[in-house]
UniProtKB/Swiss-Prot annotation:
Species per Swiss-Prot/TrEMBL record: Enterobacter sp. (strain 638)
HAMAP family assigned to the protein according to its UniProt record, in alphabetical order: BioB (MF_01694)
Cofactor entry: [4Fe-4S] cluster; [2Fe-2S] cluster
Keyword Manganese belongs to the record: no
Enzyme class, first EC level, given as a word: transferase
The protein's annotated pathway: Cofactor biosynthesis; biotin biosynthesis; biotin from 7,8-diaminononanoate: step 2/2
UniProt name for this protein: Biotin synthase
Cofactor note: Binds 1 [4Fe-4S] cluster. The cluster is coordinated with 3 cysteines and an exchangeable S-adenosyl-L-methionine.
Catalyzed reactions: (4R,5S)-dethiobiotin + (sulfur carrier)-SH + 2 reduced [2Fe-2S]-[ferredoxin] + 2 S-adenosyl-L-methionine = (sulfur carrier)-H + biotin + 2 5'-deoxyadenosine + 2 L-methionine + 2 oxidized [2Fe-2S]-[ferredoxin]
Keywords noted in UniProt: 2Fe-2S, 4Fe-4S, Biotin biosynthesis, Iron, Iron-sulfur, Metal-binding, S-adenosyl-L-methionine, Transferase
Pfam families for this protein: BATS (PF06968), Radical_SAM (PF04055)
Binding-site positions, [2Fe-2S] cluster: C97, C128, C188, R260
Length: 346
């Protein structure tokens, strides 16, 4: 178990209250101590089972409780998923994330999920899944199949959480993260900005994440995507500086974690995204829809990477796979790039 300093709420609040430019400077300094600031890790996310979720998360179009026009789909066939993973690899992603709209997976689904993980790993990609609550046996089985990362977000602070979700407790989420960690799988966990939370709630979320026995290796920070039909469709927009500030504080508090720009990037300007990279974000979802929300078209990402001089990160599992690295670099920096993968069309 890792030993790291525990943060206090007053320390986190102090960070959020820092003058913006001072905060950015501190975050960038810490970022450079642990990462190459020119490198960004690239992931692709595929919804392997969409809609009809029994949970009541007020932000989510996948909930069966809200009329969002989202058509429910059954669990995809293994070969369909692996075909999508091949396309993702050819487009340059180094991690393939598979998400299912469940409260928890059923044991009958586990053999298919294990085959998906094994197939993705055989391609030389990192494998990540987000399937809801796991029990010990399921976590161990996914670990044995080779799963690298498991995503299970805390979403917000413990104090605000009950305003967003009532069908799953905060402790259930923490318990799943513990089971995943004990099974030897890396943890991916973050939250959402724009749920109607206060700055103290954002501080409380990051406090929970940073004070886990081992902080998450990957911390996705989402900006709420307002979907018609959900209770949060009319929420106020998030101020760009408030979002960037959250990224910066996450970077300072979890200096060795990958901080990922996730949902909501489509509604961010290039300037906002650039400031997020300055604040310490060093991972993105590339070229697909984030489960059911739009993500910027790949060519826009290519252009932004080129403008900022950013390069895709080579992950540990792909060390020595120069062909893979060159493919993505060619797509990112050649003006006449061809078609890119979009999971939504599969």
């Amino acid at each position: 178990m890792a030993h790291h300093p525990r943060w206090t709420m007053s320390q986190v609040t102090e960070l959020f209250n820092k003058p913006f430019l001072e905060l950015m400077f501190e975050a960038q300094q810490i970022h450079r101590q642990h990462f190459d600031p020119r490198h960004v890790q690239v992931s692709t996310l595929l919804s392997i089972k969409t809609g009809a979720c029994p949970e009541d998360c007020k932000y989510c179009p996948q909930s069966a409780r809200y009329k969002t026009g989202l058509e429910a789909e059954r669990l995809m066939e293994v070969e369909q998923v692996l075909d999508s993973a091949r396309k993702a690899k050819n487009a340059g992603s180094t991690r393939f994330c598979m998400g299912a709209a469940w409260k928890n997976p059923h044991d009958r689904d586990m053999p298919y999920l294990e085959q998906m993980v094994q197939g993705v790993k055989e391609m030389g990609l990192e494998a990540c899944m987000t399937l809801g609550t796991l029990n010990d046996s399921q976590a161990q089985r996914l670990s044995a199949a080779g799963l690298d990362y498991y995503n299970h977000n805390l979403d917000t602070s413990p104090e605000f959480y009950g305003n967003i979700i009532t069908t799953r407790t905060y402790q259930e989420r923490l318990d799943t993260l513990e089971k995943v960690r004990e099974a030897g799988i890396k943890v991916c966990s973050g939250g959402i900005v724009g749920l109607g939370e206060t700055v103290n709630d954002r501080a409380g979320l990051l406090l929970q994440l940073a004070n886990l026995p081992t902080p998450p290796e990957s911390v996705p920070i989402n900006m709420l995507v307002k979907v018609k039909g959900t209770p949060m469709a009319d929420n106020d927009d998030v101020d760009a500086f408030d979002f960037i500030r959250t990224i910066a504080v996450a970077r300072i508090m979890m200096p060795t974690s990958f901080v990922r720009l996730s949902a909501g990037r489509e509604q961010m300007s290039e300037q906002t995204q650039a400031m997020c990279f300055m604040a310490g974000a060093n991972s993105i979802f590339y070229g697909c829809k984030l489960l059911t929300t739009p993500n910027p078209e790949e060519d826009k990402d290519v252009q932004l990477f080129r403008k900022l001089g950013l390069n895709p990160t080579q992950t540990d599992v792909l060390t020595g796979d120069n062909e893979q690295q060159q493919r993505l670099e060619q797509q990112l920096f050649n003006a006449d790039t061809e078609q890119y993968y979009n999971a939504a069309t599969v």
